[in-house]
């Protein structure tokens, strides 16, 4: 689950991570009133959307008067802000964060993530702040420093100081930076985060360390013990299809292609998308129905896939391990009839009761194209979609 920058900064502030003072506003008039509450002559007007790259896209403005705050607020509110993370359609700006300006001496990047290679939380940092970390990794990987954290000990003070030293924070501010990083690590652990990222973290002219940004992603599987965080969820920032999918324990992520995918298991789903790409197609989604797919879940999965107007065909790729292929086949037949499917449909089944499942599909009389392998299924759906 994602939250807005201003919400992330409230969490930071409550856990001892220094941030500038700021207020959220939903109208231009409110933006001016909130700016009046700040003890500053320079204001930063920030568009609040669930996407990075806002600064480069014109979503962050520096105002030196209340009239400029109002002008920038009017400019940003209601605007479709297009960044490298939103796609070409962009996201509508519905709220702003009005923040005190900071005396920036130097910008840095810091982030905590889960490193799948070590199964540990890893602290990453770079002195190339204000730049996308992926860009730094591609062009100057030697400028990214990492500390792998022992879950029993936590982020040790010597590790925090070492990374501060490595990214060239001045020696007089290293202890402040170390304290900052330890507080940030505590946010990551106590709030069950999957990502905590600040870009930029800044060193001020007075030698203080501040978080000028706040990107926090939470582990959805841990939200049951964070009711306060659940209340921060902004459904308007999420894909309605993803929201609907979550109601049925379906993992759905929309993509830009035209071939709908329904698969069980995240690994098989990614392999299916790669195979479609390999044969010249473009997946329209990632959809994992999980290990306990029922007729109802399969039907809802079809409805969600068909909710994307770009979809021109569907590839169902199911391995029946825990699930029986005959049950899945019955669900597919019932779902196709209920949604009155007219698009090309290719189904590949393998596993428990696979022959019975294939017979059910064959006897249905529906226009379901069978496939013996994932590669064959991908080739068939790519060809059929191109003929539509």
Curated annotation (Swiss-Prot):
Catalyses which reaction(s): succinate + ATP + CoA = succinyl-CoA + ADP + phosphate; GTP + succinate + CoA = succinyl-CoA + GDP + phosphate
Domain ATP-grasp: 9-244
Binding locations of substrate: 264, 321-323
GO biological process: succinyl-CoA metabolic process; tricarboxylic acid cycle
Keywords assigned by UniProt, alphabetized: ATP-binding, Ligase, Magnesium, Metal-binding, Nucleotide-binding, Tricarboxylic acid cycle
Residues engaged in binding ATP: 46, 53-55, 99, 102, 107
Top-level taxonomic group: Bacteria
Signal peptide boundaries: none
One CC-aspect GO term: cytosol
Protein name listed in UniProt: Succinate--CoA ligase [ADP-forming] subunit beta
The organism of origin for this protein: Staphylococcus carnosus (strain TM300)
